[in-house]
Each structure stands twice: as C-alpha cells, then as structure tokens.
C-alpha cells in the first residue's frame, strides 16, 4: 500500500500541468514578455509557437538554440524558476506559445493582437479641427476676393484652385477617419496635409488681385511656409503606428493661424492702389 502511494506521489510530480493564459498586445509594444515559471529542476527549456520551436535552452551546457524566424527571443532570467520569454514585436506572431521542459511540465500562453489607432482620439480630433478651420478660412478669403474685384481669368483660376484644394483635403479626411494604420488611412492623411502648400499660391493670388502685396504679406507667407515644413517633418515621423503627432499638429496649427492673419490683412488693410483687376 505504501509502495502504491509513493508511486502516485511520484507520478503526480511528473504529470503535465498546463496553465493557459491570454495576453493581448498591440503595435505599441516594443517587446513582449510571455510568462512561464517552472519549479521542478530541468535539463532543458523549450519554447514553442504552436508546433514550431522558438528557443531551446540547455541548462547543462548553457547553450541556446534560436529559430531563424525569432532571432530576438531570449529568456527573461536564467534562474531555476523564471523562464519567461522576451521577444521583440517584429518577431511576434499571434498564436499559442508553449513552455516545456524534460519533465513534461508546460505553461501555455495565447497571444492575441489588438488593433490600435494610429493617433490618439485627442490628436485625431485636433487634426480634423485644424483642417476644417483652414478650409473655412480659405473659403472666406476666396469669397472676399471674388466680391471685391471684377471677375477675370485670374480670379477664375483662384476659385478653381481653391475648390480643388478643398475637394482633395475633404476626400483625404473621409479616407483618414478613423485613424487606423493602413494604406488607405496613410493616403487619407497625405491628402489632408500635403495640399496645404498650395494655400500659399492662393494667398499670393488673393493679395495680388487686391493689390495688397507688402512686407507684411511676405511675413505671413513665410510663416505659413514654416508651418508646412513642420507638417512635412511631422508626417515623416508619423509613418508608423503608435506615434506622437505633436509635430504634425504644430504644423497644421501654424497653417491655420497664418490663414487667420491672411484674412485679417485682406479685410482690414487697404490696397496699395485703387485699380482692381
């Protein structure tokens, strides 16, 4: 009877113990730690993704064998109990990760990828607000110019140009919303921001038609050009997930402020001459 009891206790210590956990991750995670703790002494530790080996560590020879598809994988600690797996995002694949040793003890972790927004909700809202206000001010500038001068070919070009800019940016806004990181949303953001350079051309046309070209106008144009440069730099830094869009917002905000100054200058300051085109 005692011999049977000892056998049962021995078998119990060697029985396969499987604990399944679910870990959620996003593209914002640079590295991911997959937990595993093995209390029993072992000769080797093996991590698998489904049926494919990721990492095998031989505790006797202290050597590690890595899969060529998971070169960033490493053990969190080489202690007897903590054998958690650390792996970089570029090597992570959703699926079931299994930790085992020569005694058959296992810990199973299921990784689930969650999709996240390209920018946070606050930054996305500000992008739409800045773009919308800029287009509204552009509409007011063109309207004021149209009612202040006699219609001409140059005025017609200004009106068509303004309509094209507005259509491109509005289409970009529809493609960009919601701000997920996909090809469609990248194209949408580019359409929302890059046409801002043409606002400088419409500004020059408006001031030229109203004969209000002066040093102050040059300062406004340079200010808007600086905003466009900030926007382009912000775009370059934002072409990946989970980024801070502060620089991009600074550029869009600068462009919006320059449009305010332009409209104010058009309305409040007299032209340098009385003849209109």
UniProtKB/Swiss-Prot annotation:
InterPro entries: CD47, CD47-like_TM, CD47_Vset, Ig-like_fold
GO biological process: positive regulation of cell-cell adhesion; positive regulation of inflammatory response; positive regulation of phagocytosis
One Pfam family matching this protein: CD47
GO-annotated cellular components: extracellular exosome; host cell membrane; plasma membrane
List of glycosylated residues: 29, 58
Residues spanning the membrane: 124-144, 156-176, 186-206, 219-239, 247-267
Annotated compartments: Host membrane
Record membrane topology: Multi-pass membrane protein
Any GO MF annotation of the entry: thrombospondin receptor activity
Function: Promotes, when overexpressed, the influx of extracellular Ca(2+), leading to membrane permeability and host cell necrosis.
Family indicated by similarity: Belongs to the orthopoxvirus OPG166 protein family.
Protein name per Swiss-Prot or TrEMBL: Protein OPG166
Lineage: Viruses, Varidnaviria, Bamfordvirae, Nucleocytoviricota, Pokkesviricetes
Gene name of the record: OPG166
């Amino acid at each position: 009877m005692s011999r049977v009891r000892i056998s049962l206790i021995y078998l119990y210590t060697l029985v396969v113990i499987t604990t399944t956990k679910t870990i959620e991750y996003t593209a914002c995670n640079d590295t991911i730690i997959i937990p595993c703790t093995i209390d029993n002494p072992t000769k080797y530790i093996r991590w698998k993704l489904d049926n494919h080996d990721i990492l095998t560590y031989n505790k006797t020879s202290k050597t590690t064998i890595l899969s060529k598809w998971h070169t960033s994988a490493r053990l969190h600690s080489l202690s007897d109990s903590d054998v958690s797996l650390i792996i970089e995002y570029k090597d992570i694949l959703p699926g079931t990760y299994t930790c085992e040793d020569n005694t058959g003890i296992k810990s199973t972790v299921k990784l689930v990828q969650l999709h996240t927004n390209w920018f946070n909700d606050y930054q996305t809202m500000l992008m739409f607000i800045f773009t919308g206000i800029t287009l509204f001010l552009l509409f007011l500038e063109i309207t004021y110019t149209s009612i202040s001068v006699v219609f001409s070919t140059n005025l017609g070009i200004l009106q068509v140009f303004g309509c094209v800019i507005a259509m491109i940016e509005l289409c970009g806004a529809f493609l960009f919303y919601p701000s997920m990181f996909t090809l469609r949303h990248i194209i949408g953001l580019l359409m929302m921001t890059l046409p801002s350079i043409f606002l400088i051309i419409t500004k020059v046309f408006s001031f030229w038609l109203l004969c209000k070209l002066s040093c102050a106008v040059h300062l406004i144009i340079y200010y808007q050009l600086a905003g466009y440069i900030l926007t382009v730099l912000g775009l370059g830094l934002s072409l990946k997930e989970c980024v801070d869009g502060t620089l991009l917002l600074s550029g869009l905000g600068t462009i919006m402020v320059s449009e305010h100054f332009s409209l104010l200058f058009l309305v409040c300051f007299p032209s340098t001459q009385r003849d209109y085109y």
